[in-house]
């Protein structure tokens, strides 16, 4: 399966919005006391099927967020959306974080929590049931959600892989 990676998506042509998922403060003990640094996880997306995430580190919060946004624009993927939801159920893992996503009927809404919700909102998915299992570490949950969305196959992908027409795929 060919992955929908940032190689064929030009982020400059997209109207990307950003959503902050998590900020972490780190401390380095030096001779004069503690020196604080920050890292930020940011999800970017156009709410029309493109989503990516980035991690930024800096001595100031705003700089960390800006670096996260720039990093996120480099990692944008295309997500197949069918009638406001995903084509099929997926379970994705990254480390000990596990994310389960199920398609939902129109009108259900976005039922997800925490970091998964931010990813799905930025992707533009309106009707979905999602659950984060295992680790609640926002880094790993975001990476699991993105890898799950990246692994989704729509009917066109399946037809291409099987060297069949779209009609033959639906009949089999």
From Swiss-Prot:
The keyword Ribonucleoprotein applies. The keyword Lipid metabolism does not apply. Disulfide bonds: none annotated. Keywords: Ribonucleoprotein, Ribosomal protein, RNA-binding, rRNA-binding. Signal peptide: none annotated. One of its GO terms (biological process) is translation. One of its GO terms (cellular component) is small ribosomal subunit. GO terms for molecular function: rRNA binding; structural constituent of ribosome. Pfam families: Ribosomal_S5, Ribosomal_S5_C. Residues 16-79 form the S5 DRBM domain. The N-terminal domain interacts with the head of the 30S subunit; the C-terminal domain interacts with the body and contacts protein S4. The interaction surface between S4 and S5 is involved in control of translational fidelity. PANTHER family: MITOCHONDRIAL RIBOSOMAL PROTEIN S5. NCBIfam families: rpsE_bact (TIGR01021). With S4 and S12 plays an important role in translational accuracy. Part of the 30S ribosomal subunit. Contacts proteins S4 and S8. Belongs to the universal ribosomal protein uS5 family. This is Small ribosomal subunit protein uS5. It comes from Chlorobium phaeobacteroides (strain BS1).
